[in-house]
Amino acid sequence: MKKLILLAMLCVPGIALSSTKEALDYCATTESWAAQKVIDAAFERNKQLDRMKATSSLIERHKLVKGKKPITFEDWGQLYTQTIEISIPYIDNHKKPVIFIASSIISAEECSLTEVAYFDITPENN
């Protein structure tokens, strides 16, 4: 019985860490709030973009710390800064996709703690 309890205690933290990573990873997908804000704004400016084929990838994610203490929010836990790249192709595929870099503060509980900051890094626009 003691072995079973010990095994359960060792497995539970792994499950919690796994679900935290999955929740944070969701914040980097095209379905996330930050990506949708960027995709919606880009589509409003240019209706030739194919918003359904947009892609998003994680560039960087860091825990927020002050000194050596993690910065946490009572309701949402550990806070992170996250930067993602969002690529939105054109419907006709004759032009290169529009590419954005977007950054926001997130937690495993909430992908929309701050307004997303983003800018266009499409090579022809630089």
Regions found by a protein language model. Name each.
Residues 7-8, 13-60:
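N-terminal trafficking/processing presequences and adjacent post-cleavage segments
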Residues 6-7, 76:
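Short amphipathic alpha-helical "recognition" segments used for binding
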Residues 101-126:
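A short, surface-exposed interaction/processing loop segment used at functional sites
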Residues 25-29, 84, 113-119:
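Charged, low-complexity, helix/coiled-coil-prone segments
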